[in-house]
């Protein structure tokens, strides 16, 4: 895992999500008077990190990250201002195998946590076509447009 800072310069965070996300940012000035915000997800800090370090990391670059994120929204059932988020990311691969690998990582994680029955949904036609080909079922399955 690669940990990224909980605080980012506000210019890194603003405009990367929706207007709603921008409104939910916890923002303030640090001791140097710079505008900063608390990360609302783990993807934007990863993108900044990758832009700075990808030349030394190599591609494809894979990582997982479990960390706290913050959102300034009204608390209600299932919605919190501070919560843990888990990301599994791959940068630099256009292969459908990456999506399949992500599903397998989720499967193995849930099994390791003791879950026996669960459903994983992947919304990618290319993944389904790839699985059908791998299982030699592509010719016998109905075409998916």
Regions found by a protein language model. Name each.
Residues 1-145:
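Extended, charged alpha-beta segments that form solvent-exposed binding/catalytic grooves
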